[in-house]
Regions:
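Dynamic "connector" segments at or just before major functional cores
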Residues: 1-159, 165-185, 189-197, 201, ...
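Generic beta-sheet signal
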Residues: 131, 207-209, 231
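Generic beta-strand/beta-sheet core signal
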Residues: 136, 179-181, 210-212, 232-234, ...
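Generic recognition of flexible, low-complexity loop/linker segments
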Residues: 153-155, 197, 219-221, 280-282
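Short, surface-exposed acidic/glycine-rich loop or hinge patches that mediate macromolecular interfaces
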Residues: 186, 214-215, 300
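Short helix-loop-beta connector
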Residues: 203-205
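Acidic, metal-coordinating catalytic cores used for nucleic-acid/nucleotide bond scission
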Residues: 209-218, 237-240
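An anionic, glycine-rich sequence signature occurring as long contiguous blocks
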Residues: 222, 227-303
Length: 303
């Protein structure tokens, strides 16, 4: 039977006898864990033991697995060297079944509290600058038997069950800020307002959010505007918008951006109450004139 005392005894024996490991570089993560207070936060995430294994150590293994494991769905456990467990204070590697049990017992509220606290500590330590925030979403194919709406999977180019992830990232440091995971069928309009609220709680300062075309929704942009969040995103390509850009008089392309002519005008978006700034680049490629448009609610931003 595995108990905390038996784990500690076996761990001390392994350390006394010495070991070699391809994962020894992971020990350089120890100061980072101490800075962030990873042990304390994992204690609050799931205080109960999982089969006698301290949840803090199991949580550390999951974190390290994201660094050393393979991406995507795995059929076999590719980490078999027992010394890998020593990074998490364990004399062995917990099985995928144990990891899944760990995830299944974590309440969603605890997960969000963990991410909020982690984000706030990163901000305090200077790992997040919080000036420009990348906002994006991805669908990860799910093989769950649960009935759920289907989402479009861009990689596979099919509609299927998926886990919808919505996240924010600090553009300057490339560090993650917050993440939400939802079932298939969850749209950006449903998930992003709360995602922005959590990001604001972490950063504690106004920021500009860079988004993709999926966020081109008037009601969503209106909600973000009410929260005081500045956004910039590419204009959706449509015949209507192309004609609108082509109709801009040449005299309005008075500015330059990376050697390309730029017009700073205004446009309207359905379900958004006010005019939006419309930044239009005029590009000459392959003897053709092309237009690239961006919209923003930031009236003070310098193109």
């Amino acid at each position: 039977m595995v108990t905390p005392s038996s784990i500690q005894k076996e761990l001390e024996e392994r350390l006394r006898s010495g070991f070699t490991s391809p994962y020894v570089g992971g020990l350089f993560l120890v100061p980072y864990h101490l800075q962030l207070g990873s042990w304390e936060m994992l204690s609050n995430l799931l205080p109960d033991k999982i089969g006698g294994i301290p949840p803090q150590k199991l949580g550390l293994q999951v974190i390290h697995h994201s660094l050393y494991g393979i991406k995507g769905t795995r059929e076999l456990d590719e980490l078999r060297e027992s010394s890998y467990g020593l990074l998490s204070g364990l004399p062995f590697i917990c099985s995928p079944v144990t990891e899944n049990r760990f995830f299944n017992q974590i309440p969603t509220a605890h997960s969000e509290e963990f991410l909020l606290e982690m984000g706030k500590r990163q901000k305090q330590l200077g790992y997040l600058k919080g000036n420009i925030v990348n906002t994006d979403s991805h669908s990860i194919r799910s093989f769950s038997r649960m009935h759920m709406p289907k989402s479009y999977l861009s990689k596979e180019k099919i509609y299927d069950k998926s886990i919808r992830t919505f996240w924010t990232q600090d553009q300057e440091t490339k560090n993650p800020i917050f993440l939400k995971a939802s079932y298939s069928g969850t749209t950006v309009s449903m998930a992003v307002p709360d995602l922005m609220d959590k990001t604001l709680q972490i950063l504690q300062n106004p920021f500009l959010s860079a988004m993709d075309k999926e966020h081109f929704v008037g009601t969503l942009l209106s909600q973000l505007d009410e929260k005081g969040i500045r956004v910039i995103l590419p204009m959706r390509n449509s015949d209507k918008r192309l004609k609108e850009m082509e109709a801009i008089d040449a005299s309005q392309f008075t500015q330059r951006f990376e050697g390309r002519r730029l017009a700073d005008v205004f446009t309207y978006l359905k379900d958004y109450p006010d005019p939006l700034r419309f930044l239009v680049l005029k590009v000459r490629e392959d003897s053709e004139t092309k237009y690239v448009g961006f919209i923003t609610n930031d009236v003070n931003m310098t193109p």
